[in-house]
Regions:
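Catalytic-histidine neighborhood of serine endopeptidases
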Residues: 5, 169-213, 217-220, 229
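PDZ/PDZ-like groove recognition
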Residues: 156, 161, 333-403, 411-437
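N-terminal targeting leaders that route proteins to membranes or the secretory/organellar pathways
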Residues: 1-151, 158, 175, 223, ...
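A conserved glycine-rich beta-strand in the N-terminal activation segment of trypsin-fold
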Residues: 120-130, 146-175, 198-200, 232-234, ...
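C-terminal, low-ordered peptide segments at domain boundaries
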Residues: 117, 216-237, 243, 424-437
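Active-site loop architecture of trypsin-fold serine endopeptidases
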Residues: 149, 157-158, 186-188, 222-230, ...
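Short glycine/Trp-rich loop-beta-loop segment that forms part of the substrate-binding cleft
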Residues: 234-257
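C-terminal cap/linker of serine protease catalytic domains
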Residues: 97, 115-116, 127, 299, ...
Length: 437
């Protein structure tokens, strides 16, 4: 039987909306403090969606086996008469008595040992399942609806759906992170919650570099039971994730809603290049779907990655996620409908080692200049090496992005770059008027 969706009745709420605040993380490898987060004004309460506002209940995974008491087999000694005259021989029985058990080295029977191992294995997965309880309450299904006409000129609704994540609650709206491709050019957006309550949502803002977007739901459309059962996502630190760490993929990692899969992180060093930035990817050994979506959860019940299969290597359907720490500021800006300053280049780091080998100056090597971007308008070209933004020296794309975040749309910044000519590299400056994303 098909379960009919529960359509929510409006419940009036009078809370004053507050600004969304997503606290950043410190990258232990950078030696730099995280960017300051945008905080609410004194008249509005700050909303913390990192999970620090409420203690995250986590279950420790214990895969150790309990000590078993060692049973000892009684060795019976029997003395029998020897056929030889006047002689006796003491013999030790090496065969177990009929009906007795044969014990292994550790004192357990083979059957008991196998049963114990299986129970420990089962308990391990049960513990891993339990740590996903709070993250699962933050998951929703986002549906993009368009009206189309069939061959017989009959109207019908075409629906596409994907996982969404509640990243903030300002007392008036729930802010849901999802992929823009599902809501682009649709006529209606709906969100389904944990109890099958279905409500309309509105588009807030999207980021073209990552393909992520925020949609929001008016909380007055949800009844008290639905609100009590949901949670704001506990966002962890992806900077603490290492190769080999266990993770649980939750949502629709294999293309089916409300599914989970277990695995380990196989790589934390892969990156994706985006306009004016780059993001780390968390690659796992979990086989997923090209249409998979959802989250990656660590054993503390914290979300460390957003599944984005569009970034999975071609021909390789393993579950891949964008590291959460690097997009927290982006999530905050999208939730607050704040534009980000834009120059329009893709770049890569020129490390000291690479500089020594190639003679390219240290800095950010431009691999692409976006068409009609502020960078192109200012005269910047591919293979220029950016060394300063304003008065601040930049040697990595991360430093470049951090400095870029200090500017607003319309600001004019002087970009210093090195350009190769007939006599080697020469310094050039470009006055760039910041665009808007």
């Amino acid at each position: 039987a098909v379960t009919e969706p529960k359509i929510a009745e409006a419940v009036t709420r009078e809370e004053t909306p507050a600004k969304v605040d997503i606290p950043g993380d410190e990258d232990p490898n950078s030696g730099q403090e995280p960017d300051e987060t945008i905080t609410a004004s004194s008249a509005s309460a700050s909303v913390d969606s990192s999970g620090s506002g409420s203690e995250i209940s986590s279950s420790t995974v214990d895969s150790s086996t309990s000590e078993s008491s060692v049973s000892e087999s009684t060795v019976s000694e029997s003395t029998e008469e020897n056929g030889a005259a006047g002689g006796t021989e003491s013999s030790t029985s090496e065969e177990p008595e009929e009906g007795s058990e044969v014990f292994g080295v550790d004192g357990e029977t083979d059957a008991e040992e196998k049963d114990s191992s299986l129970k420990n294995y089962e308990a391990l997965y049960q513990d891993m399942l339990e740590v996903t309880e709070k993250p699962k309450r933050a998951l929703v299904t986002v549906i993009g609806i368009t009206n189309q006409m069939d061959y017989f000129n009959q109207n019908y609704e075409n629906q596409q759906q994907i996982s969404g994540l509640i990243v903030a609650d300002n007392g008036q709206d729930l802010f849901i992170l999802t992929e823009y491709r599902i809501v682009e050019n649709v006529e209606r957006i709906q969100v389904t919650f944990w109890d099958e309550t279905m409500v309309d949502a509105t588009y807030q803002r999207h980021d073209p570099s990552t393909g992520l977007t925020i949609v929001k739901v008016d909380e007055s459309k949800l009844d008290e039971e639905t609100r009590d059962g949901l949670a704001v996502a506990p966002l962890g630190s992806s900077y603490l994730v290492s190769q080999g760490d266990p993770v649980v993929a939750v949502g629709s990692p294999v293309g089916y809603s409300n599914s989970i899969a277990y695995g380990v992180v196989t790589s934390v060093t892969n990156k994706i290049s985006a306009l004016d930035n780059e993001y780390n990817l968390l690659t796992t050994d979990i086989l997923g779907s090209t249409d998979g979506s959802g989250i990656l959860v660590n054993l503390d019940g914290e979300i460390v990655g957003i599944i984005a299969q569009s970034y999975s290597a071609k021909g390789n359907n393993v579950v891949t996620g964008i590291a959460i720490s690097q997009i927290k500021k982006l999530i905050e800006n999208l939730s607050n409908n704040v534009s980000r300053a834009y120059i329009g280049i893709r770049g890569q780091d020129v490390t000291e080692e690479l500089s020594d080998k190639t003679g390219i100056p240290k800095g950010v090597l431009i691999s692409r200049v976006a068409d009609d971007s502020p960078a192109m308008m200012a005269g910047m070209k591919e293979y220029d090496v950016i060394v300063k933004l304003g008065e601040h020296k930049v040697e990595t794309i991360k430093q470049y992005h951090e400095q870029l975040g200090k500017y607003s749309t319309g600001d004019v910044v002087t970009v210093t770059a090195m350009r190769k000519g007939a006599e080697g590299y020469a310094e050039m400056t470009f006055d760039v008027t910041m665009g808007e994303v």
